[in-house]
Swiss-Prot record:
EC code: 2.1.1.33
Protein name (Swiss-Prot/TrEMBL): tRNA (guanine-N(7)-)-methyltransferase
Molecular functions per Gene Ontology: tRNA (guanine(46)-N7)-methyltransferase activity
One GO location term (cellular component): tRNA methyltransferase complex
The family this protein is said to belong to: Belongs to the class I-like SAM-binding methyltransferase superfamily. TrmB family.
Keyword flag Membrane: no
Gene3D superfamilies in UniProt: Vaccinia Virus protein VP39 (3.40.50.150)
Biased composition regions of type Acidic residues, renumbered to the chain: 17-27
Chain sites annotated for binding S-adenosyl-L-methionine: E86, E111, D138, D161
Source organism per UniProt: Burkholderia vietnamiensis (strain G4 / LMG 22486)
Residues the entry annotates as binding substrate: K165, D197, T232, K233, F234, E235
Function description: Catalyzes the formation of N(7)-methylguanine at position 46 (m7G46) in tRNA.
Amino acid sequence: MMHDDPNEAGLPPDDAALPDEAADGADEVNPLHHRRIRSFVTRAGRVSTGQRRAIDELGPRFVVPYAPTLPDWDAVFGRSAPRILEIGFGMGASTAEIAAHRPGDDFLGVEVHEPGVGALLKLIGEQGLTNIRIIQHDAVEVLEHMLAPESLDGVHIFFPDPWHKARHHKRRLIQPPLVAQLAARLKPGAYLHCATDWQNYAEQMLEVLSAEPTLENTAADYAPRPDYRPVTKFERRGLRLGHGVWDLVFRKRAA
């Protein structure tokens, strides 16, 4: 998920024991196995009254329950349109803004934390958005079971948890097995857009994405921020302090 607010990110203290630490050795053999090293830590988080109301009132329409089957996404969205997957939308502000400015595209947001789901649903209600659907589940399992090969027109992964301690780098979301899964689900010519404010993670992203043979970089290395990606409050504050932000935009090679 986006880590704009450390309290929402669910990140443990740097030296805290993590729930699946003991299983790390086995998971590294097959990173997409169901006991793999996860890129997130599930925390309860406080759901506000407004978020709870949005979940109760709008969830039945806009939240798609996870199931290990392929849905009819045209039926889910009520139309056939370009489909963009967003992994880890945080509190949903960027998702809602992008969807509002791109009404011809449909957006599927995947987020594990309930406050973020409630926050995005609240924005959907306030702005009258109809082109967003949400799955509250682990994105890797959603990719494996709910999205068909060559079914996506784009993927957004903005500011995933950086796991900045070296011993936790294996928990970072952008790893070769996940990128291969994402690439397989992109249509030829479709794009994968990642953004991070951690230089070390940006370098890892560039290395991993460049190594995926079915993807090609749209820039020499890092791309200018595309106009459709909003600058978040957290990002704006960081830029004022001289912190960097790195965007990477890759495309699926033609068959």
